[in-house]
């Protein structure tokens, strides 16, 4: 089970300060998780400029130009934001047994290390 999932609110904890044009301290929602490369795509964070070649689409409209998109950032550079305190926190797990259809299953529940509450 991943500590950071799609839809979580995270805060950038490393990198250049905001005064210098960086993203440290900014918060954003996780748009996508790349588990094979340990990276996450965060809304409004690590924006890069992409230049694409000018061409024509099938409908005859012009394509290409300069666009600004988000690039993935490494998981170690972000921290999950605790929903109750709105501050970055570490994530732990708590094992809980759930009974469903007569069978008991053990599930892992994400817990904030700072407050001890479920996330």
Curated annotation (Swiss-Prot):
GO MF terms listed in the record are: rRNA binding; structural constituent of ribosome
Cite the entry's keywords alphabetically. Answer: Ribonucleoprotein, Ribosomal protein, RNA-binding, rRNA-binding
Which CDD domains does the record associate with it? KOW_RPL26
Q: Name one GO cellular component term.
A: ribonucleoprotein complex
Q: Which InterPro entries match?
A: KOW, Rib_uL2_dom2, Ribosomal_uL24, Ribosomal_uL24_KOW, Translation_prot_SH3-like_sf
Q: Which domain of life is it from?
A: Bacteria
Q: Which NCBIfam families match?
A: rplX_bact (TIGR01079)
What role does it play? One of two assembly initiator proteins, it binds directly to the 5'-end of the 23S rRNA, where it nucleates assembly of the 50S subunit.
What family classification does the UniProt entry report for this protein? Answer: Belongs to the universal ribosomal protein uL24 family.
Query: Which protein, by its recorded name, is this?
Result: Large ribosomal subunit protein uL24
Q: Which organism does this record belong to?
A: Paenarthrobacter aurescens (strain TC1)
Instruction: List the lineage, top down.
Output: Bacteria, Bacillati, Actinomycetota, Actinomycetes, Micrococcales
Name of the gene: rplX
